[in-house]
C-alpha cells in the first residue's frame, strides 16, 4: 500500500504554536540549534492532504512500506504485545433476525486485543516502525493526542518497551480510560472538548506544545502516520478474509482517524472487489460524504473514539462506497443490546456500527455476509452508557424504563421550583468585576449571555480564581476568556428526578428554554435562552419546604 509522509507546514500556514522547535520524523539531521529551529516545524496539521500513492491494482512489490503478515500465537507468549491481533469473528444471532436481516451478520471483536481495542494494532505498529527506522530510541518520550484508546495501546507498549508516555485527551473521555492510562504509567493531560482541532487548547495543539518543550519526544501522530492504515491492511483485513474464507459482501466500520476503514477497505477492494464498504460517522462530525450528510446544528456528541471536525490525513474516503450518520441514542441502545442479547461486552461506537449495519444490510440476501467491526470494550464506559443514571441524565433512558420506587417529588416539573430570574453577565465584563459581582450577590456561578440573551457559556468563581492564580488570565481580561462550556442543561418541563440525577454529578444545572426567531429572509432559527440556574440547595430547600408545609 504505497504512501508518502506529507510535508510539514510551517510559518504563516495557520500554526497556533510559536513556543519553540521540535524534531519531527525525517527532520533528525544534526546541525546547530539555529539551523534546526529554522528547519523544523512547530506543528504538523492532522488534516494535511494525503500524498499516499496507493491505487487499486498496483502490485504490492511497488509499495515503499515494510509489510507484515498475521502470525499465529505460540502457546506461551514472550510478552503481552503478542496478544495484539488475531481477534475472533463472532456470529450475531439475535439482533440481525430482530431487524429482519436475511444475510449473515458477523462481528470482528477487536476488544479481544491486549489493551481492549482496535487501536492496540496501530499503537504497536507505529512504535515498531519508528524503532525500525531509528526515530524512536531507548529513553525517548512518546506523546500522542488521542480519544483514549490509542493512548491505552501506546501506554501498554511503552510500559513493555520502557518508554515514557504522555497522553493528551479531551475532557469528555471516560474516567475509566484515564484510570487505565494512569495504571499503565502514562502521564495524562486533559483539554477542552469543544476546542477546535487547530486551536492551541485542543488535544492536538497541546500535544505539539509539549513536543516542542520536551527533549527527545515524538508524536507518532495517528492522524498522519502511514503505519495506522498499514496495520489494518497487513493484519486486520487478512484476518477477516481468512475467517470468512474470502466470502463477504459488506463491511461496516465506524470512522475516527480513518485508519481502520482505509486499511481494511484497500485490502478488501484488492482481494474481494464485490464487497461494499460502509462508513459510519456520528452526527456532529464532518467525515461523511456527500457533504450534505454533515449538515446539522449539532456540534458535540457523547459517543467516543469516532468522528472529527477535520478530515485526518490517513482517511481515504474514496474506498468507502456509502456513508451513514449515527446518533448517540441509537449508539448506546444498540451497544446495550449487543451486551444483553449477544453477550458481546463492547463500547458505544460498536453500537453505532451495528445500528447502521442493520439498515445498510437490508439490501443483502440469504447466503450473503456482512461483517461489522466492534472497536473496543465496555470496560471504558462503566460509568457512562452502562450506567442507568448516566443514561437518564443524558436523556437516553426514560423514567418509566426503570422500576425502582421514587420519592413523592420525583415526577414534579422543574417549573415547580419557582426559580428567580438569574444573574447573568456579558462576555465583555472583566474577570475582576465578575468576581466582585458573584461575591456580592452570593453566587458561585453565572451564565454568560450576549446582548440578545443567547447563552454563550458559564463562568464559575472557582474556575476564574484558579485561572487567575495560574496566570492564564488577568483581572482586567474579559470574562469571555474563561467561559466554561461543559455544563448540564435542563428545561422547565423536565422532572425533578432528572434534575436530581444531574446534581449527583454536577454542582449546578442551567435551566433553558428555546425561542424560535424568524428572520427577514423568511427563515427561522432556534435560540436557547437562560431561564435560571438551579443547584442542589434549591432542590433540597424545595423538598424541605413542601414536607414542612404538609406537616
Swiss-Prot record:
Changing residue 427 to L: In CBSD; no effect on cystathionine beta-synthase activity; altered stimulation by AdoMet. Keywords: Allosteric enzyme, Amino-acid biosynthesis, CBS domain, Cysteine biosynthesis, Cytoplasm, Disease variant, Heme, Iron, Isopeptide bond, Lyase, Metal-binding, Nucleus, Phosphoprotein, Pyridoxal phosphate, Ubl conjugation. Changing residue 176 to K: In CBSD; severe form; loss of cystathionine beta-synthase activity; inhibited by AdoMet; severely decreases homotetramer formation by promoting formation of larger aggregates. Changing residue 49 to L: In CBSD; decreased expression; no effect on cystathionine beta-synthase activity; increased homotetramer formation. Changing residue 336 to H: In CBSD; mild form; no effect on expression; exhibits an activity lower than 4% of the wild-type enzyme; altered stimulation by AdoMet; absent capacity to form multimeric quaternary structure. Changing residue 540 to Q: In CBSD; no effect on cystathionine beta-synthase activity; altered stimulation by AdoMet. Changing residue 228 to K: In CBSD; loss of cystathionine beta-synthase activity; decreased homotetramer formation. The keyword Amino-acid biosynthesis applies. It is an enzyme of class 4 (lyase). Allosterically activated by S-adenosyl-methionine/AdoMet. Activated by S-adenosylhomocysteine/AdoHcy. Binds non-covalently to a heme group that may control the redox sensitivity of the enzyme. Its EC number is 4.2.1.22. One of its GO terms (cellular component) is cytosol. Changing residue 165 to Y: In CBSD; severe form; protein expression is comparable to wild-type; loss of cystathionine beta-synthase activity; no effect on homotetramer formation. Its cofactor is pyridoxal 5'-phosphate. One of its GO terms (molecular function) is nitrite reductase (NO-forming) activity. Its main location: cytoplasm. Pfam families: CBS, PALP. Changing residue 548 to Q: Presents 60% of the wild-type activity; highly reduced capacity to form multimeric quaternary structure. This is Cystathionine beta-synthase. It comes from Homo sapiens (Human).
